[in-house]
Amino acid sequence: MDVESSSPSSHALIKKEKGGWRAIKYIIANESFEKLASMSLIGNLSVYLMTKYNLGGVFLVNVINIWFGSCNILTLAGAFVSDAYLGRFWTLLLGSIASFIGMGIFALTAALPSLRPDACIDPSNCSNQPAKWQLGVLFSGLGLLAIGAGGVRPCNIAFGADQFDTSTKKGKAHLETFFNWWYFSFTVALVIALTGVVYIQTNISWVIGFVIPTACLALSITTFVIGQHTYICAKAEGSVFADIVKVVTAACKKRKVKPGSDITFYIGPSNDGSPTTLVRDKHRLRFFDKASIVTNPNELNEDGNAKYKWRLCSVQQVKNLKCVTAILPVWVTGIACFILTDQQNIYGILQAMQMDKTFGPHNFQVPAGWMNLVSMITLAIWISLYECVIIPIVKQITGRKKRLTLKHRIEIVMGIICMIVAGFQEKKRRASALKNGSFVSPVSIVMLLPQFALAGLTEAFSAVALMEFLTVRMPEHMRAVAGAIFFLSSSIASYICTLLINVIDAVTRKEGKSWLGDKDLNKNRLENYFFIIAGIQVANLLYFRLFASRYATENKKGH
């Protein structure tokens, strides 16, 4: 495995010998096996914690949301380690190993009854709670899985993007296709996880159901290592996050400096140590330009490099900061999208657990975790139709290969419709259960199909568009940062959900009846919470239309 410097000549030479689609197949395989394993847990985690650990109510939702958030916020640490020390290859490999150990712990919790509390006969009235040490074992497995996700998520798509030369039109076209097929391939893995593995967990054995994803992670690691001879591996050249803090600090220290015509800016050395020149961005956030102003010749050493890196930063470091700030207005819109998908991953599954799950003439029992499959199938069908049918037809008609713009994809109102539908479906489910006097509503689980399908379309339009926007607008050396920022939006969404749920629970509990506090959804008012989420989606659409859309349509690159 060769390590590539980022100078243009060596970059072009190595790209001729390595990278491209022959490297991508190993990277996508690694991602697919990893996603198959992780979604085998994520898709059924609510069911496992509720049925095997007797968790429920706000505590159950808090555990899942905080874990979701931790998985995603640790992508910042993963991106930092990748950029500053290990590089993307080793960060991906070590992250996969951490996930493997974490999943192994989950397999042990399923195999050893002593690691779990005693089972409950009546799920609506259960007092058998897990001991603190049992929760400690459970949380250690979740923690290792979060660490693994922090290493894999920011680097996988960035490592894949490294395999293409985006300075050419052909390379850019390959990269755009890679985005969609990357999403499609792991969606196929999710379909397998949410059908076969979730079915085994629910109806056959939790032990086998966790051994399978553990084995998948072993395959993910093996496949990734086998392909190492085909990879273009960019050298770790320092953390962009650390540079951003340095720029802010240096600019604040020089806040009284007034730019003039006789000002000298510190360009900094090139990647091979030789002098270089860069064009300074003069139009945005000019305050931070002060960080690269040489106010005293003593700030430079004999080689012309900065002596004090917290007082003098290069023009490139300032540009990196401006790249990040330029994408923030559009990035914020992704948070609302992930708030929506979090509801389906948690409350959607809890709804399914309290509905009639029989299907067909033979009364087949549909696992509640299968409902996430609807979202993934919808997403996969849309991407396949879009890439293989819609675009070729449009090209035949117009003679040009037209695609939906980023602005149009984000403006799709699927999220608003999804939560309104979910709210009315929950009202119907709850009313039927109360009328019937039962924990499980006689309403069929099939009634949840529309809201899960709409959630899949929301992700297909908004999440894929956001991922593409962040990756394309960042320079090559900041692609791991783009991946981390993408998952940071999901992390913030999970923490917002946690805060929102606890605030709603506290406020409504004071009024005498909590909307979300009971383990039995029939005693809650979940539909009101869904309508609040719909309101957040409306506010997000207005924010994008009135403010952020201008940043989505800018043609200027971040490099």
Curated annotation (Swiss-Prot):
GO-annotated cellular components: plasma membrane
Q: What is its main location?
A: membrane
The record ties this protein, via SUPFAM superfamilies, to:
MFS general substrate transporter
Q: Which GO terms describe its biological process?
A: pollen exine formation; pollen tube growth
Mode of membrane association: Multi-pass membrane protein
Expression (tissue specificity): Expressed in flowers.
User: In which domain of life is the source organism classified?
Assistant: Eukaryota
Q: What's the protein called, per UniProt?
A: Protein NRT1/ PTR FAMILY 2.8
Organism listed in the record: Arabidopsis thaliana (Mouse-ear cress)
